[in-house]
A protein has these predicted regions:
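Non-cysteine beta-strand/loop elements that form the S-adenosyl-L-methionine
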Residues: 255-274, 334-344, 364
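Hydrophobic faces of well-ordered beta-strands that scaffold small-molecule active sites
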Residues: 209, 241, 266-268, 305-307, ...
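Flexible, acidic/Gly-rich N-terminal and inter-domain linker regions that tether
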Residues: 2-73, 81-89, 94, 99-134, ...
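Conserved strand-turn element in the central/C-terminal portion of the radical SAM core barrel
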Residues: 284, 297-317, 374-375
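Active-site beta-loop-alpha junctions enriched in small/polar residues
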Residues: 214-216, 246-248, 269-273, 310-314, ...
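Active-site glycine- and acidic-residue-rich loops that bind
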Residues: 242, 248, 313-324
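Conserved Radical SAM active-site core
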Residues: 104-137, 141-265, 273-276, 288, ...
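Auxiliary Fe-S-binding modules of radical SAM enzymes
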Residues: 2-6, 19-20, 102-109, 319-438
Length: 438
């Protein structure tokens, strides 16, 4: 398959026929080549547009709202620049969505994210993950108690915005209860990429774009729709994409991943397979067993997959880790398993301990509590990192360790060894692996 065949398909668009005095608006759906493939009446919601595109277009096609006859449901302004949507799906221009209040759905306050950033350079190349990152939203409904994101400037320095957009008083304490979407990201990304003249590609980042590092890109249908559009735009330009999600809903875009033919790798965070234990500190996340099943489906379809075995718990024995890695090998044959023990620093660790205790996971809470002692934490990290590396070699599972910088500092006679692990330029992945031109 040639590269030109890979990027087959572009933007579909909607054309509106002005209604008569007693008629609803009528729309025709055009392919990139100009063929009409469907007609319907009535102004569509954003969900209808995105889902119609997913269900009827070719995998690497999508309806682009900036190129379509879509008008603000409130003021009737044509949508040709920034836009958002209400919880019910009404498409609004940016002026109108900015004045629209957030709304609660399933216990999560939802609204529009005013962030101007589209794609950002990322320091995660130090973990061999990417050079760029795209976040489809601010906030996350999963509410993992150990999550580092609410302790980053992206949340801490935007408290006024969070208060204004979602009535959030404390971005960290309320993590999991707010979600601000970037609905127009696929449209803005397409135009950003068309203007972009340089592309960073370090040895450890490989020029990869990660979706997402600050939220879960498949946590619900709306986030998934944004993600699909972004993946399509990146793959059409032959840019490698790394998906990281805890949601089994990722399988909904298997058609796109297969059509990408080597430019997409899909991974999930699976620290262990004891659903109740994981649920205690990842209260809004799908069960790890469901994540495993989703990755198995994707792997069986021939799409590259990886696992983030992070963060592993102090309750996990060497045999637990062996069984987990054996399961990954047998079910997934992953390109790599990234591994990282839990980090006891920051206010989120206190929340993690409390959540485990409140969920009745007393042993987990007690073992986590012990990690406040630096020597205990160093010993636990040393044991788990060493065990996972040895077990990976024993089971023929490719491993890439993520030792914490502070751990390396106190690793004693193993400091040089773990520092080399920390500074490795490449993970064992054979990725990206684009198709060979014929």
């Amino acid at each position: 398959m040639s590269n030109s065949e890979l990027v087959k398909g572009s933007h579909m668009r909607l054309h509106r026929t002005e209604p008569g005095s007693w008629e609803k608006s009528r729309y025709s759906v055009f392919t990139q080549s100009g063929s009409v493939i469907d007609n319907f009446s009535g102004d569509p919601t954003l969900n209808q547009v995105r889902e119609w595109s997913r269900e009827n277009g070719d995998p690497l096609e999508r309806v682009d709202l900036f190129e379509s006859d879509i008008y603000c449901a409130n003021c009737s302004k044509k949508i040709d620049e920034r836009f958002g949507a209400t919880v019910s799906g009404d498409i609004l221009c940016w002026d109108c969505i900015s004045q629209s209040p957030s709304d609660e759905r399933n216990g999560v306050e939802q609204g529009a994210d005013p962030t101007k950033a589209i794609i950002s350079k990322s320091a995660l190349h130090h973990k061999n993950l990417c050079n760029y990152v795209i976040n489809v939203a601010t906030g996350c409904s999963h509410g993992c108690k150990f999550c580092y994101v609410p302790n980053t400037p992206n949340i801490k320095m935007r408290q006024d915005m969070l208060k204004e957009q979602a009535d959030v008083d404390d971005g960290q304490e309320e993590w999991g209860s707010y979600l601000l979407y970037r609905d127009d990201l696929p449209e803005r990304l397409a135009r950003k990429l068309d203007r972009k003249r340089t592309w960073e590609q370090t040895e450890d980042g490989r020029g990869v774009v990660m979706i997402s590092s600050g939220t879960d890109c498949y946590q619900d249908c709306r986030a998934a729709q944004i993600t699909r559009g972004c993946v399509i735009e990146l793959v059409r330009r032959e840019l490698p994409v790394r998906i990281l999600t805890r949601s089994p809903a990722v399988v909904r875009d298997l058609d796109v991943f297969k059509a990408a033919r080597g430019y997409v790798t899909v991974g999930s965070s699976i620290p262990c397979l004891k659903d109740e234990q994981v649920r205690a500190i990842e209260p809004g996340s799908p069960a790890p067993s469901a994540r495993l099943d989703a990755l198995e489906t994707i792997s069986n379809a021939g799409v590259p997959v990886y696992v983030s075995m992070s963060p592993t718990y102090p309750t996990q024995s060497r045999e637990d880790l062996r069984n987990l890695l054996r399961t990954f090998k047998n079910k997934l044959d992953p390109d790599v398993v990234f591994h990282e023990p839990i980090n006891p620093r920051g206010g989120n660790f206190e929340m993690t301990v409390n959540a485990a205790r409140e969920a009745g996971q007393e042993r987990l809470a007690e073992e986590l509590e012990k990690l406040r002692d630096r020597e205990r934490w160093v010993e636990y990290s040393m044991n788990q990192l060493t065990a996972v590396e040895e077990l990976g070699e024993e089971l023929d599972v490719p491993i890439h360790l993520w030792p914490d910088k502070q751990f390396v500092k106190y690793a004693g006679d193993k400091e040089d060894y773990f520092r080399r692990q920390l500074e490795k330029d490449n993970s064992p992945e054979d990725y990206p692996h684009p198709p060979t031109a014929v």
